[in-house]
Every structure is written in C-alpha cells, then in structure tokens.
C-alpha cells in the first residue's frame, strides 16, 4: 500500500506530491479549512506521516494522538511545535520533528527592522507625513551601534541576530540556560540582562517554563525607556503587563510579531499605541525561508519512507522496530504506469 501522508498546513496536494518524487508510492490527503477537529481526527487516524499546521489552526492534542496508531512521524514545517502534545506523542511512539533554523535569517532580519523602526520612530513618522504633518523635531532617534542589546535565548535566531548587531557595533548580551561560545557576545544572568539592555529581544520556544517569562516583574526590571522585541511566541510575554508598562511610559516601545491570541482582538489596547510596531506573525515569512522549510519537510519524510530515522526530533522518540516494519509500496515505474488502461 502507498504511504498515507496527511497535510494540515496550507499546502496543496500537488505541492506535497511534487516534493516526494522518490521511489515510494504515497497518498496525500489535505484537511480543509476552516479548522475542523473531526476532520483532523478522521484523516490522521489512518496516516503514517503527518505534516503539522504551521498556522497553528489544526491542533494535535492527546485525544487525537491516541488514535493515530499507524503514525510514525509528525513533521512541523516550522520551528515551533506547541500545537502538538509532544509528550503524549512520545508515549504513543510517534516522533515529532521541527524545522529548526530554517527561518533564522528571516526572523533576525525582522528583529533588526523592528529595532530600527522603534529607535528612529519610522512608522510613526510615516503616518504623520501621510496625515499632512512634518514632524522633524519629534523624530530625533538613537543609533543602534550606541545601544546595548540583550538577547533572551541564543539559539539559531539569537546567533543570527547577534551577528547582525555586532556589525552595527552594538554591545550584545545574552541570557540562556546553555552557555554558547560566540566572539563578541557576553553571557549574563536573565535579571542582569533586563537591567542592562536598552533593547531586550526574546527568542525562546514556548513551554511551561517560558510562559509569561516576560511578566510585570521582568518588565519593571527593564531600564526606563527600554524597548522590548518579541518574535518568538505570544504567550512568552504577559500582554496585560506589557500594556501597563507602555501606558506608564516605563518602556519606550515594543516590537511585536506574535501575540497571546492570534489574530489579536480588535479591542487589544496594543493596537492603538503609537509606540508599538506590529506585524501579523510573519517574521519568518520570506521566499528563501519557505524554500528551506519545504526542503526540510521533503528530506525528513523521505528519510522515513526510506527506512531511516528522522532528524530534528524534538520529543526523543526513536522509531526503531516500528520503522523496520514499515514497508510502503514502491512507486510504479513510468513503463508500467497506465498499463491497466490499455
């Protein structure tokens, strides 16, 4: 039988089929929008391979995973995988893999853009000019090279960001549970980073430990007039506490690509604040990053189809015997395709 692949991301059936041109026959199924938990359960129950939803609309909780007895791998076409109960997946022997690092340059670029926008009041000035103003006196800014920037989480994105900041001449600090060896970057405690940095950039995965990592207490420790940039996950920052810190002018501004609820509600006070730079969770959205993530998806699905362990597994599962008993049908050769129609 062909291997059944269920795609929960907004890729077409043909896009997925075109990725997998190897020696194994595959059956690709896509799940329609809007999100329908019953459709996800129905299709994923019969799947050997699942492409997770990069939009975070279709979720895979324990209640669905426990029925996915045929599934070997859930491949996220993203870095984050919080739409999947990865611990439950491990209990059921399902490997969960992500696309670590595929968008590091895109997100690092976005973060620098947000910083420059805030410290030079770029979007604010653009709006004033469009309204007929000429706010020259109000647009005195700062140079990025004169600032101390703190990076919370020096992973793939954090390292790419540090490289860019060093080129600007910034002093770069980082706080991470893991010590990294990177010339020109200084490791400090999380608390010291908050107190020393003119700009705090958050680049950590969402977990129980990082939920509301940036809370009222953390914001209060930041320097008067400092800026907060979040391009990781919305719930890493307590939005109510952030609103209070911005309204009180304790913070100079914030750059946000992610929110606690997405899309963020129209009545979110952040929407009306002049000192906030927004984008709708598109920090990693570039043509180059999209090409790379499709390569990661292709390579990992192909590895499993070929009988090899997947890479970038985030929940510690090795497929072992399950993989050895997985025998997808070979792809029909062109010479035999359509013979039944003769």
Spans of features found by a protein language model:
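Hydrophobic/small residue at the entry helix of a nucleotide-binding pocket
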Residues: 157
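Rossmann-like adenosine-cofactor binding region
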Residues: 58-60, 171, 177-269
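Phosphate-binding beta-alpha-beta segment of Rossmann-like dinucleotide-binding domains, i.e.
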Residues: 92-94, 99-148, 160-163, 167, ...
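N-terminal glycine-/charge-rich "phosphate-binding" loop or analogous flexible N-terminal tail
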Residues: 1-55, 169-173, 322, 326
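Rossmann-like dinucleotide-binding domain for NAD(H)/NADP(H)
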Residues: 96, 225-328
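A cross-taxon signal for low-complexity, glycine/charged-rich
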Residues: 330, 337-341
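Conserved N-terminal Rossmann-fold NAD(P)-binding element of oxidoreductases
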Residues: 151-152
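Phosphate/diphosphate ligand-binding glycine-rich loop within oxidoreductases
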Residues: 48-126
């Amino acid at each position: 039988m062909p291997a059944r692949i269920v795609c929960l991301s907004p890729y077409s059936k043909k896009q997925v089929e075109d990725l997998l041109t190897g020696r194994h026959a595959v059956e690709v199924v896509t799940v329609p929008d809007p999100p329908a938990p019953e459709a996800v359960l129905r299709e994923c129950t019969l799947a050997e391979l699942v492409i997770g939803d990069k939009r975070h609309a279709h979720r895979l909780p324990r209640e669905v995973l426990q029925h996915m007895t045929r599934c070997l791998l859930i491949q996220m076409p993203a870095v984050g995988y919080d739409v999947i109960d990865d611990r439950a997946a491990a209990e059921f022997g399902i490997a969960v893999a992500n696309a670590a690092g595929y968008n590091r340059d895109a997100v690092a670029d976005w973060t620098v853009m947000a910083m420059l926008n805030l410290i030079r009041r770029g979007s604010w000035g653009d709006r004033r000019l469009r309204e007929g103003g000429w706010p020259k006196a109000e647009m005195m800014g700062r140079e990025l090279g004169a600032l101390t920037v703190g990076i919370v989480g020096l992973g793939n994105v954090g390292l790419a960001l540090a490289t860019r900041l060093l080129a600007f001449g910034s002093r770069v600090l980082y706080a991470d549970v893991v010590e990294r060896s990177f010339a020109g970057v200084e490791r400090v405690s999380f608390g010291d980073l908050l107190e020393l940095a003119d700009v705090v950039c958050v680049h950590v995965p969402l977990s129980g430990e990082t939920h509301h990592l940036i809370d009222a207490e953390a914001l209060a420790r930041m320097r008067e007039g400092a800026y907060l940039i979040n391009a990781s996950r919305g719930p890493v920052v307590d939005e109510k506490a952030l609103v209070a810190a911005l309204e009180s002018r304790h913070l100079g501004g914030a750059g946000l690509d992610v929110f606690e609820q997405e899309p963020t509600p129209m009545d979110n006070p952040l929407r009306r604040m002049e000192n906030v730079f927004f984008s709708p969770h598109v920090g990693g959205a570039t043509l180059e990053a999209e090409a790379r993530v499709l390569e990661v998806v292709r390579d990992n699905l192909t590895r499993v189809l070929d009988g090899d362990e997947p890479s970038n597994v985030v929940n510690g599962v090795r497929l072992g015997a399950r993989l050895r008993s997985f025998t997808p049908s070979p792809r029909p050769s062109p010479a035999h395709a359509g013979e039944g129609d003769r």
